[in-house]
């Protein structure tokens, strides 16, 4: 029968600065099943290095190491991690209990990496192990609430949870007083009597005396190997020791993944303020994405509704801009439309139902001691019907008022609010660019289209605007209502030909253009889509900055938790387990930040509606996009810290100061 542990000519050296220090110099050793071995030696003798190799926390530079006849050198990292979990139990001088976890969770920690599905019996098993060391009543305490001796007993309970064949104890009484040291050694002695193989490192002869075999080391070599004449009689076992081959569940298995999620949440909540500050960048980024995209989408929908109200059979005729020697002459500099053009186009019946000219300008509106700067629109008689602008209160001006150039006005709700507050504006006299006008109507509320307030407007008769207020003899444009929607293209071609003929323009002249509402809708939709993408891109920069902040915090976390990583690997965590844990933590922080940012973004969007009156629309797409992007950001920026954590060697991580 092969030995349980067998070393042949093992050598191990470490590089310290520019010097190479030999820790083990050709050590050969055999340990049988059921032995209690104490390895003694002064500091620097190589005893801890030997224990680390025996416990699979380190690998030799030269020589061979076999466990139950299997060469460790042929095993993969995952296979060695599995052996640490199933075969070995570790008791450390520094206890290595995770301070943010309860005693019960510390004891159950090896089960996370065991490949065994979590069950209701797991808690009972943890309680049973704590009862063995006399700490069942401390189940929900944290390590900081225990004495040193109690913490070491918890470490022993943790080492036993997987029922290992071998207990590796590294100076188990080094940090304890005499009474606690005796209690720990009684527990180890009892485990040996139950058949456990125990390999213990100590520098105290009275502690080594508990063992049946004492190996003494000096300068990396074994100088003595003594066995007691009266060794403890162990229960006989005829069955050979076989290395376990338990399959590890895939990382996406929900029960295994839930363990990593629980661990990640504990890590996040353990440093609440730091986690919150780390999430802040993601929170701002997601809130910006939601608010900006809601604003852009709201503007697009508002414009679509307004264009829809205008009708799909509407044409807009505008004078184009000509260039002389490369210099633009401005809109309508060549082709200028007059009221006569409007009358001529309106006469194209039955193709055309109505036509109305418009002029645009700015107005300084004054009432009493209040004044307001607004947009001025001079419109024809049919404009109110054609553009859904008929007053909700009061009336539209008459054809006679238009002909007489009467000074009457329809004002938007914004102008009414600024000048009159809550009082009725009808019949009141206001000054528009220092000219007295009588308010005869209140225009229907249309709200905002993006940042543009459609209710900040004053409408007056076209003739009044041209000849009394603005002093113009040409129009800004003409709106044409086609009799039937399916004849819009025909009407556009007919009107274009008519204008060229009337103004004696060549066929290829581009000094005017005609657009229907569909074209305008496409143009505005394209513009708002571009603006939404631009705003979203700007907001996404915040997410990237937040992701960099997450990466920075995770790198700091890896450094702070180096010993914890070493402990987890000693308990059987694979490289992929460590990587997954840190990725879940990173993604968890960004997702939490994303959810908070989502709520803040929705609040900001609703606030813009309530306070500024802007049209906003929160789409499911923007919510899903922001949430997905925050998760991807966490995974992407958490990858490097996770890889760095996974690459740490167990023994180096445990030694980290």
From Swiss-Prot:
Disulfide bonds: none annotated. Its EC number is 7.6.2.-. It is a multi-pass membrane protein. GO terms for biological process: response to antibiotic. GO terms for molecular function: ATP binding; ATP hydrolysis activity; transmembrane transporter activity. Residues 5-244 form the ABC transporter domain. Its main location: membrane. The chain crosses the membrane at residues 276-296, 533-553, 591-611, 620-640. Keywords: Antibiotic resistance, ATP-binding, Cell inner membrane, Cell membrane, Membrane, Nucleotide-binding, Translocase, Transmembrane, Transmembrane helix, Transport. SMART domains: AAA (SM00382). It is an enzyme of class 7 (translocase). GO terms for cellular component: plasma membrane. ATP binds at residues 41-48. It is found in: Cell inner membrane. InterPro entries: AAA+_ATPase, ABC3_permease_C, ABC_transporter-like_ATP-bd, ABC_transporter-like_CS, MacB-like_ATP-bd, MacB_PCD, Macrolide_Exporter_MacB, P-loop_NTPase. PANTHER family: ABC TRANSPORTER PERMEASE YTRF, MEMBRANE COMPONENT OF TRANSPORTER-RELATED. Homodimer. Belongs to the ABC transporter superfamily. Macrolide exporter (TC 3.A.1.122) family. Non-canonical ABC transporter that contains transmembrane domains (TMD), which form a pore in the inner membrane, and an ATP-binding domain (NBD), which is responsible for energy generation. Confers resistance against macrolides. This is Macrolide export ATP-binding/permease protein MacB.
């Amino acid at each position: 029968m092969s030995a349980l542990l067998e070393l042949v000519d093992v050598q191990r050296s470490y590089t310290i600065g520019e010097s190479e220090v030999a820790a083990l110099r050709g050590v050969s050793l055999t340990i049988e099943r059921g032995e209690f071995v104490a390895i003694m030696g002064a500091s620097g003798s190589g005893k801890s290095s030997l224990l680390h190799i025996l416990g699979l926390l380190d690998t030799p530079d030269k020589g061979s190491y076999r466990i139950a006849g299997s060469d460790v050198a042929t095993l993969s990292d995952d296979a060695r991690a599995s052996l640490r979990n199933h075969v070995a139990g570790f008791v450390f001088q520094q206890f290595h209990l995770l301070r943010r976890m309860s005693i019960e969770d510390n004891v159950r920690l090896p089960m996370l990496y065991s490949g065994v599905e979590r069950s209701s019996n797991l808690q009972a098993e943890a309680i049973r192990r704590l009862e063995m060391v006399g700490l069942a009543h401390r189940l929900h305490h944290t390590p900081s609430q225990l004495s040193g001796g109690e913490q070491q007993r918890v470490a022993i309970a943790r080492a036993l949870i997987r029922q290992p064949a071998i207990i590796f104890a590294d100076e188990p009484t080094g940090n304890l007083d005499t009474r606690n040291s005796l209690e720990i050694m009684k527990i180890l002695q009892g485990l040996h009597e139950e058949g456990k193989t125990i390999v213990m490192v100590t520098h105290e002869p009275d502690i080594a005396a508990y063992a049946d075999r004492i190996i003494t080391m000096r300068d990396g070599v074994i100088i003595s190997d003594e066995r007691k004449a009266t060794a403890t009689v162990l229960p006989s076992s005829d069955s050979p020791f076989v290395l376990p081959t338990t399959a590890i569940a895939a990382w996406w298995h929900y029960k295994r993944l839930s363990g990593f999620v629980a661990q990640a949440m504990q890590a996040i909540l353990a440093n609440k303020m730091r986690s919150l500050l780390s999430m802040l960048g993601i929170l701002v980024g997601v809130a910006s994405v939601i608010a900006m995209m809601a604003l852009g989408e709201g503007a697009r929908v508002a414009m679509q509704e307004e264009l829809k109200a205008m009708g799909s059979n509407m044409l807009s005729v505008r004078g184009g801009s000509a260039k002389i020697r490369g210099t633009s002459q401005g809109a309508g500099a060549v082709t200028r439309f007059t009221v006569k053009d409007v009358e001529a186009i309106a006469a194209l019946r039955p193709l055309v139902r109505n036509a109305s000219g418009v002029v645009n300008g700015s107005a300084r509106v004054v009432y009493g001691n209040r004044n307001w700067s607004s947009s001025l629109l001079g419109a024809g008689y049919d404009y109110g019907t054609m553009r859904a602008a008929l007053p909700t209160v009061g009336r539209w001006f008459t054809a006679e008022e238009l002909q007489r150039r009467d000074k009457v006005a329809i004002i938007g709700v914004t102008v009414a609010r600024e000048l009159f507050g809550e009082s009725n504006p009808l019949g009141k006299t206001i000054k528009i660019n220092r000219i007295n006008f009588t308010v005869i109507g209140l225009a229907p509320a249309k709200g905002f289209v993006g940042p543009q307030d459609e209710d900040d407007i004053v409408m007056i008769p076209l003739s009044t605007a041209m000849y009394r207020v603005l002093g113009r003899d040409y129009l800004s444009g003409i709106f044409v209502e086609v009799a039937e929607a399916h004849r819009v293209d025909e009407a556009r071609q007919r009107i274009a030909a008519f204008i060229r003929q009337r103004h004696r323009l060549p066929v290829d002249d581009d000094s005017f253009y005609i657009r229907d509402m569909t074209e305008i809708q496409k143009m505005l939709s394209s513009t708002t889509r571009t603006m939404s993408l631009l705003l979203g891109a700007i907001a996404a920069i915040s997410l990237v900055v937040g992701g960099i902040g997450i990466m920075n915090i995770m790198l700091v976390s890896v450094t702070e938790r180096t010993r914890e990583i070493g402990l987890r690997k000693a308990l059987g965590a694979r490289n992929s387990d460590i990587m997954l844990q840190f990725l879940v933590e990173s993604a968890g922080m960004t997702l939490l930040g994303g959810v908070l940012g989502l709520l803040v973004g929705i609040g900001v969007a609703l606030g813009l509606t309530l306070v500024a009156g802007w049209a906003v629309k929160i789409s499911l797409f923007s919510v899903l996009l922001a949430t997905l992007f925050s998760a991807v950001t966490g995974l992407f920026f958490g990858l490097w810290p996770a890889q760095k954590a996974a690459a740490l060697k167990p023994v180096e991580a445990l030694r980290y100061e």
